[in-house]
């Protein structure tokens, strides 16, 4: 019999063996070397057990995040793994379904993950929330601005509240309000086993206006003279453009120390238009985190315009959660929404059920609309959805495109 339950502390050896094989197999068969830090307020562990044996496991997070201007609790799914001899037997799929159901029971509407294989998660209803642009510059290219009026200062875990204030000042959907433990153990700590990162802030008039967290790595070449030092930015946050320019200027000051500066920014941060000699830079577009709604009734917790009155039928397809796969009546009165399932006589997948629905979408696209990956017209072009003209205007009032940035990896 397969059961879903927390992974007890007494099973840590099994868990280390699973996670070491799944995520760092290049270290060889040495699960005892895998670091499994378990601060109680960072995550908890869930697993599928069959006849007492651990088959599949994951880390389950809870975050305080910004969603369309509201402070909300969202879930996080990380380190999803199955033993190699048990793969392709639906364990990971079943584990994911149980995690989503548990989050829904706890009142969590939205869950995020960092995908290892995007197509795999897409088949289970997850959608890419946003993209990143990864840049590689020489340090000299970042010295395009005059020296800023403020000053630079080293920051540590003791500054976590000031750092959090900077991140919240950026006002982006999916930005996390991280706990003190997260700042100390993850953002500024050696959680990956590669050493503590460096961290500096930019201050002006006594106020922290931005900060950057980074590592410096040496990459060997075929000869000692070909070795490259790379400054890799883990996180860069600023409350305004002055803070951003100041931090880029700070990174540019490493020209005598490193050969390359690598950083990742949201797509609207168009650094090629600012740096010197942009034709010599490298810029690649990469998929970011994925998101998924736990239930269609999550629409009831969105901030709908107070003057909006509308009613429409919504057809949703969900390959993983049966309760989401069907038709729903959405009613909005004076900005207060109500979502109710509509009973149908046929099979949930019958095309006849789509007849008469004002809006048809899969859970992936609905999740992207929910966080603001697309606005409605763009979703029709890029997503798997179709909207009657009568609902385009009211839906556009709630599903506007947002600036998104979930930068914390988990």
PLM regions and their residue ranges:
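Short amphipathic alpha-helix that is part of the acyltransferase structural core
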Residues: 1-57, 70-76, 142-182
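Intrinsically disordered, low-complexity, positively biased terminal segments
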Residues: 2-5, 9-12, 154-410
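Conserved beta-strand in the GNAT
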Residues: 47, 53-63, 76, 81, ...
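A conserved beta-turn-beta hairpin within the catalytic core of GNAT-like acetyltransferases
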Residues: 65-76, 87, 219-232
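Conserved acetyl-CoA pyrophosphate-binding loop and the N-cap/start of the following alpha-helix
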Residues: 86-95, 242-246
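Conserved GNAT acetyl-CoA-binding A-motif
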Residues: 103-115, 256-266
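Conserved active-site alpha-helix within GNAT-family acetyltransferase domains
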Residues: 107-109, 115-133, 268-284
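Aromatic-anchored glycine-rich loop motif in surface-exposed flexible loops
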Residues: 130-146
């Amino acid at each position: 019999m397969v059961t879903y339950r927390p992974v007890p502390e007494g099973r840590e050896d099994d868990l280390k063996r699973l996670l070491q094989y799944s995520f760092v197999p290049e270290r060889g068969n040495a699960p005892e070397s895998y670091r499994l830090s378990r601060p109680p307020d960072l995550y908890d562990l869930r697993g599928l057990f069959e006849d007492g044996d651990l088959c599949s496991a994951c880390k389950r997070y809870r975050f305080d995040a910004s969603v369309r201007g509201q402070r909300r609790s969202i879930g996080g799914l990380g380190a999803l793994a199955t033993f190699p001899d048990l793969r392709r037997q639906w364990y990971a799929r079943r584990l994911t379904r149980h995690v989503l159901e548990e989050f829904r029971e706890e009142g969590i509407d939205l869950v995020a993950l960092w995908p290892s294989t995007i197509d795999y998660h897409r088949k289970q209803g997850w959608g890419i929330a946003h993209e990143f642009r990864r840049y590689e510059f020489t340090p000299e290219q970042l010295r395009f601005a005059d020296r800023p009026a403020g000053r630079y200062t080293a920051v540590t875990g003791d500054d976590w509240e000031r750092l959090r204030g900077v991140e919240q000042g950026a006002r982006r959907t999916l930005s996390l309000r991280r706990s003190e433990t997260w700042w100390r153990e993850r953002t500024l700590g050696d959680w990956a086993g590669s050493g503590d990162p460096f961290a500096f802030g930019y201050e002006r008039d006594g106020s922290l206006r931005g900060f950057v967290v980074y590592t410096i790595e040496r990459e060997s070449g075929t000869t000692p003279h070909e070795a490259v030092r790379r400054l890799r930015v883990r996180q860069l946050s600023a409350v305004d453009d002055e803070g951003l320019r100041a931090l880029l200027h700070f990174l540019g000051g490493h020209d005598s120390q490193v050969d390359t500066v690598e950083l990742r920014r949201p797509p609207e941060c168009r650094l090629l238009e600012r740096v010197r000699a942009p034709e010599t830079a490298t810029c690649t577009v990469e998929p970011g985190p994925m998101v998924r709604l736990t239930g269609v009734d999550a629409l009831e917790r969105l901030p709908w315009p107070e003057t909006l009155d509308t009613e429409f039928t919504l057809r949703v397809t969900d390959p993983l959660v049966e309760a989401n796969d069907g038709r729903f009546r959405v009613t909005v009165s004076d900005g207060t929404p109500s979502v109710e399932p509509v009973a149908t006589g046929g099979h949930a997948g019958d095309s006849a059920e789509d007849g008469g629905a004002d809006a048809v979408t899969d859970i992936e696209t609905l999740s992207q609309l929910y966080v603001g990956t697309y606005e409605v017209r763009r979703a029709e072009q890029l997503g798997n959805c179709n909207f009657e003209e009568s609902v385009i205007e009211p839906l556009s009032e709630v599903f506007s495109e947002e600036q998104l940035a979930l930068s914390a990896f988990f």
